Amino acid sequence: MYPAHLLGLLAVCVSLLGAASIPPLPLNLYQFKNMIQCANHGSRMTLDYMDYGCYCGTGGSGTPVDELDRCCKIHDDCYGEAEKLPACNYMLSGPYYNLYTYDCVEHQLTCKDNNDECKAFICNCDRTAAICFAGAPYNKENYNIDLNKHCQ
């Protein structure tokens, strides 16, 4: 099979999985994305949060520009605390690589009891952030801002 065919097949499979409401893909960032979609009822695309304010997306510095950006800073800080946990500080066990289990029922997020200490901590970081995102207003003027100007 040609690589282009494999990519097409993969795209179809991923689309079908999403359409069938099958549980999220087992990758932490996909889990976080799906938590955000659960909490905000799918009202905003997850990519809208990727380059927002000073803290939503990669890195972060300065003072958060608004409530939503504060949610991202709190999430970043929470992941920083997770990395300090002995259960989370070995290779491929940190917040970006550890897979946890959770439920989304009627837009309510619950981290499951079968998570170990590290997974439970990370799940709660993501859960808290997703709920925070859902409750914070989205200000379009804070998307893709000049970080050198606004985030020092």
Curated annotation (Swiss-Prot):
Its EC number(s): 3.1.1.4
UniProt keyword terms in alphabetical order: Calcium, Disulfide bond, Hydrolase, Lipid degradation, Lipid metabolism, Metal-binding, Secreted, Signal
Tissue-level expression: Expressed by the venom gland.
Superkingdom per UniProt: Eukaryota
Main location: secreted
Enzyme class: hydrolase
GO-annotated cellular components: extracellular region
PROSITE patterns (UniProt xref): PA2_ASP, PA2_HIS
Residues that coordinate or bind Ca(2+): Y55, G57, G59, D76
Pfam families: Phospholip_A2_1
Residues at the active site: H75, D126
UniProt remark on cofactor binding: Binds 1 Ca(2+) ion.
Residue ranges annotated as propeptide in the record: 22-27
CDD domains linked to this entry: PLA2c (cd00125)
Signal peptide: 1-21
GO terms classed as biological process: arachidonate secretion; fatty acid biosynthetic process; lipid catabolic process; phospholipid metabolic process; positive regulation of fibroblast proliferation
MF (Gene Ontology): calcium ion binding; calcium-dependent phospholipase A2 activity; phospholipid binding; signaling receptor binding
Bridged cysteine pairs (disulfide): C38-C104, C54-C151, C56-C72, C71-C132, C78-C125, C88-C118, C111-C123
Protein name (record): Acidic phospholipase A2 57
Species assigned in the record: Hydrophis hardwickii
Taxonomic lineage: Eukaryota, Metazoa, Chordata, Craniata, Vertebrata
